[in-house]
């Protein structure tokens, strides 16, 4: 059976709720507790070309990310996210090393509006940006936003194009949480058929139709010929209706797959930090 990994995006996607202003204690303790929980990949925030603010999970240098990482937990990988629509300049990106993030995940869009207001292709721009990330020595995860925009032919062409960069993973991203499991599985199968088997397949869902958990369960039972990565966050904290709940999918994987995620630290994050954020700015269906 292929390996299924858990990526926690609490400090990154969760930041859409509070403008990434978690505070220094919440950030450091959330990181520590997620390390205790044993998630496979820990996403720490965004790389953006904007002023850095202490206590906020938006970074404008790799050195700031390194300071948060500190001593890496053996066997765990650390990630940050960048966006082609608001790119962190590649000339400001330090080459990868053992102390910094292992992975940079890049949000790419199918189209964009040009200066005249016309919709134009954006994938070539995304490809070149991702190519620059790889050339700096980072592992790349390609996050094509809103897969529902793509026809089968367009999606396959996109997957084959980005596979040329030999990324760690290409994702199926349900940006607005509007796709049912059958639709998302269709895109997953397209990707599975058209990528080399060593490239992982990722799923990033939102819970607008209360289907993030059921979709993840369906995908886990599919006989893909590659490893998978599932994105999740504590109590589903994230944009809109929120994400796949880390504590729920972790418990399910422990029971069904024999993984060894520790759920108690995830619940501690909720009790100490996420609950207060939810009380001020709730998310969910």
Region roles according to the model:
Residues 1-285:
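Catalytic cores and adjacent flexible loops of soluble metabolic enzymes
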């Amino acid at each position: 059976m292929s390996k299924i990994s858990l990526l926690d995006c609490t400090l990154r996607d969760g930041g859409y709720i509070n403008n990434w202003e978690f505070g220094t204690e919440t950030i450091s303790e959330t990181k520590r507790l997620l390390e205790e929980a044993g998630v496979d990949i820990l996403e720490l925030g965004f790389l953006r070309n904007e002023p850095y603010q202490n206590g906020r999970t938006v970074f404008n240098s790799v050195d700031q990310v390194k300071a948060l990482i500190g001593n890496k937990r053996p066997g765990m990988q650390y990630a940050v996210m960048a966006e082609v629509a608001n790119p962190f300049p590649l000339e400001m990106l330090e080459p990868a090393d053992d102390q910094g993030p292992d992975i940079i995940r890049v949000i790419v869009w199918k189209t964009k509006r040009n200066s005249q207001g016309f919709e134009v292709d954006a994938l070539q721009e995304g490809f070149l940006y991702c190519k620059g990330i790889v050339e700096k020595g980072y592992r790349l995860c390609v996050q094509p936003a809103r897969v529902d925009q793509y026809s089968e032919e367009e999606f396959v062409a996109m997957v084959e194009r980005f596979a040329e960069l030999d990324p760690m993973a290409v994702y199926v991203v349900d940006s607005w949480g509007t796709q049912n499991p059958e639709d998302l599985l269709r895109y997953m199968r397209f990707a599975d058929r058209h990528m080399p088997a060593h490239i992982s397949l990722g799923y990033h869902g939102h819970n607008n139709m209360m289907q993030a958990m059921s979709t993840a369960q369906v995908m886990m039972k599919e006989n893909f010929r590659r490893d998978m990565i599932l994105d999740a966050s504590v109590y589903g904290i994230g944009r809109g209706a929120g994400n796949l709940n880390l504590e729920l999918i972790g418990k399910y994987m422990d029971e069904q797959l024999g993984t060894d995620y520790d759920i108690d630290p995830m619940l501690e994050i909720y009790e100490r930090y996420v609950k207060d954020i939810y009380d001020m700015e709730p998310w969910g269906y």
